[in-house]
Structures are given as structure tokens and as C-alpha cells.
Amino acid sequence: MLTDMEISSRASLTNVAELGAELGLLPEEMLLFGSTKAKVDLSVQQRLAGQSRGKLIIVTAVTPTPHGEGKTVTSIGLTQSLKAIGKKACACIRQPSMGPVFGVKGGAAGGGYAQVVPMQELNLHLTGDIHAVSSAHNLGAAAIAARLFHESRLGKVEFEAQSGQAFLDIDPAQIRWHRVLDHNDRCLRQVQVGLGENNGPVYESGFDITAASELMAILALSANLADMRARIGRLVLALNRQGQVISAEDLGVAGAMTAIMVDAIKPTLMQTLNGAPCLIHAGPFANIAHGNSSIIADDIALKLVDYVITEGGFGSDMGFEKFCNIKVRQSGQVPSAAVLVTTLKALKANSGIESDTDINTPDEIRLEAGFANLHWHINNVARYGIPVVVAINRFATDTEAELQWLINAVNQTAAFGCEVSDAFSQGEAGAIELAHTVVRAADTQSQFRLLYPDDASLEAKLSTLAEVGYGAAGISLSDEAKQQVREFTSLGYAHLPVCMAKTPLSISHDPIQKGVPKDFIVPIRALVLNAGAGFVTALVGNVMTMPGLGIKPGYLKIDIDEAGEIIGLG
């Protein structure tokens, strides 16, 4: 079989202007970037304001493993197969961060014959949205540092006289706004800034990856440009010496930060291998952020097609949970069905049983033990009142006997149905039955419900998420986290939903605990207020907001050939 890059480079593409017209966009609603991608202007939202809406399908997965579960492959394959059976469908996915592309995970365009193409354009830069987020974010960091510098050297009276601005009295120890970078770079996690003569005052800071920026979450959760401007104004950059919030609006930088992102708020239109449309927009990670593509992209697609396929990052305890409790809570766009992706390899890897046996060989004991993880995720999705279809992403090494065993086991659960997907190897022809089953599931009446109400306390929300959402015995709050609960409550933010930043490699906080962990306590070391995005992040265990590169990073394989074409992406 050809590599992903070879398949992408040999694809016959529809001109993006024609693709947009087929989708229902007007020429003036598209800003073309060559023939392969286009920005979609938000004026389409107003034009289609009264349009009936299609059905939203959320794709999630079991607990991820190093073998790859194929969630994006399934999302794109399902979109292709829906088109093949005569349904008007559109995928809505996140823009890949270059951190994972050059790190361990690789690209995020799907794979095999279920890809968004050209995949190299999607995985590297695309239309520059992530760079815009980085620039806007770092402008905020530069502005707060500059304001601190000038206020410190001049004092209140002279600063106000010279600048015509109010003295903010910034507390250097309470500057909450780091800088960001779209690469994995662990040495920047903790830094001191302001060193050297006339550069201070010195204060502790750090860098996060851009996907963890609150601006990225704002991009994904905004309803329109005006909403994004208002949210950016609410960003909490620091506290003053009296413990009061200093926002981007207070600093006078919110307008300029928004100006940098006026094009980034427009989704990018691309296509799958069989010419189905795909809107790519925003890229928050699901472990350290809320892990879903934008509300705007979903809104546009739902007004143009019958079925919108979107996905949440990592397992159902991560991106799917945040899709429900954060994204849907803010958008009101309720899903009609869910697709839960699994593989035989994933179940064996999640069994918790150490084995020297090749994971590609039949292993009844590990498969049956690992099924508990899939069963947990089925029940977790069903908890939200959404019909769930299990998609088994087939690998070439899978045996029919093990596949049939798994289908029979799934049919004894709360799942609506179970289908084997060959989208990776067969493209649109490989997920036809999955498409039919998903259509039937979406035609049933979803009874969507949230996990907790807005008016619950922050501590109650954290406890509910840990105990009901993960099956934990409870939570433990550090002294810092307890103080932050009190602080955020006193500032009027207790109504916000919570976003757990934890490992994706286990349902629990501990990546070593496989399968369905029990009797564990979720340790919450700190909270982060995201007043603009509209949620409070809980940092669980040792999760980092700036990843690091491994000993064999992905960039080692990436180069250009003699013709100047990119090679090694996948």
C-alpha cells in the first residue's frame, strides 16, 4: 500500500472554488488560497441564519495507545462514505499543531485512503491561523511586561501624567499570562524575564504550546467576531497588588489582539480524497485544553449539509467530555449521535496485562480483559444521552475470529450498533455500513444531558467530573488549588464549567493505570482561570502545558526531495 504522502500527492482534487460552490457557498464568501484551500467568510452565517440545521455527529475513542486508534481516519472515512451513499456531509476537524507533527504523534489529516488533502498543507502552517494566535497571545505578554516596566520606573503620578492611562499597579508575582510557541520545547517551561539593565522588573514566567493558549480556546468557542472581541477583552492577564483582576481590556490591548486574529476566525475549507468538504478550524489540545474544533465551523456546516462529522481529542474521558460539558454548553449545538473508535490492538494494550506476545497476534485473554476499557467508554458516552455506534478500525493483521468476538461483545452493551471500518485501506467503500448505521442512530431521539449544572460550586464540579466522569473515589486539592477555588469564587467565576488537564493515557490521572482504574483519588495541584474562553482549567498530576521532544522526534524523517516536495510526513 502507498504511504499517506504518496496517496495525498497522487490525489485528483476538485478546485476549492468548485468545492465551495457545491457546498453552498457564494464566491464572495470564499477567500481562495490557491486551488486547494479557502477561508470561509463569516457573512455566510448571516445569510443562512434561518436555514434548517443538519445533524451533528461526534467521533471519540477508547483510551489512546501508541499504536494509534484511527479516530481521524474514521471521521474522514465516515464523511467520505456518507457522501458515497448520497448524503450531504462535511467534516469539521482541528488544525494540527506543529508540535506533535515534529514530535511523536505525527500529522492529523487522517491516513491511508481516508485523508484530508493535500495533507502536507494541512499539517504545516495551513493558512496561518496558529501563527496568528501565537502573535496575538505574545502581544498580550509583551504589553503586560511593558506596562509593568513603565509603571515601575515612573510611579503612579508620573506614569498617568505622561501616558494618559490609568495606573494598574501590576503585581509581578501575579502575572498570569505566559508566552506561547507552536513547538515542543521543554526548556522554556519555566523562565525568568526582565533580566538585564533596563529590561525589568524580573519575574517568573514560562512558555506554553500555542494549542494550550486561552486564545486558541477562544477561537474555538466564539460564536462570531464580536463575541471573540468581547472574550479577548475578558482575558485575565494579571492581578494588581490589591488582588483585583487586570484584563486585556484594562490593559488596552484587546482590540489589537483581536485585529491580529480577524482572518483566523474564518474556517478553512479543504477536501477529503473523494471530494467531500472539510472545514478546519482551531486546534486546542484535548489533554491540556478543551480539545475540539470551532463552534463557528460546526455552525456553518450544519446550515449547509445533512450530516456534520466532528471529533474530540483522545478518549471519551477527554475530548468528548469537554465537547459535552464545555463546547455544547456554550454553543447549544446538541449532537445526534456519537461514534466510538476502537481497535483490537487498543483493547489488548489497555488490558493491563504484560505480555511478550506481538500485539498483532491473536490473544483472547488480553482482548477480553481490554474489552472492559471499551465497555467503560460506551457507558461513558451513553451517560450523556447520546446513541453511540462503535467503529472497529481494522488493521491488516486483525483476524476475523477476534473481530467477530468483539462485535458480539459490543452487541451485549448499551451501544446502538457496531461496524468494522476499512476506511484506511478502502476509502469511501470501506465504511459504507458504518455510514448507514450512523444515519440510523442519528435518526433516533437524542436525550442529551450535561454532567453538572452551571450553579454547582467549582469544587462540586471537579468532584462530579472525577467521580462520575472518571470513576474516581474522589479528588484531593492542593493548598494552592483550595486558595484558587476561593479566589475564583470571590471574583465571580464559580459558574464556569471546568476543564481537566490530565494525562490522556489512562481514564485516571496516572498513565500507568490501564483498563478501568478503580479506587483512585484525582490530585488537583492548581487551577487556571480562563475568563475569556469561559472555563476553569484544573491541572491534574504532572500534566505539562508545554510538551517536550522525545529521543526519536518526528522531524528526523521529514525533508524535501530533489523536486522540492515534502517527504516523511505521516
UniProtKB/Swiss-Prot annotation:
Q: Which gene encodes it?
A: fhs
Q: Which CDD domains match?
A: FTHFS
Q: Does the keyword ATP-binding apply?
A: yes
**Top-level class of the enzyme under EC nomenclature:** ligase
* EC assignment: 6.3.4.3
Q: In which pathway does it act?
A: One-carbon metabolism; tetrahydrofolate interconversion
Output this protein's name: Formate--tetrahydrofolate ligase
Q: Name one Pfam family in it.
A: FTHFS
Q: Does the keyword Repressor apply?
A: no
Enumerate the UniProt keywords alphabetically. ATP-binding, Ligase, Nucleotide-binding, One-carbon metabolism
Known catalysed reaction(s)? (6S)-5,6,7,8-tetrahydrofolate + formate + ATP = (6R)-10-formyltetrahydrofolate + ADP + phosphate
- InterPro entries attached to this UniProt entry: Formate_THF_ligase, Formate_THF_ligase_CS, P-loop_NTPase
Binding locations of ATP: T65, P66, H67, G68, E69, G70, K71, T72
The entry assigns this protein to a family as follows: Belongs to the formate--tetrahydrofolate ligase family.
What GO molecular function terms would the record report? ATP binding; formate-tetrahydrofolate ligase activity
GO terms for biological process? tetrahydrofolate interconversion
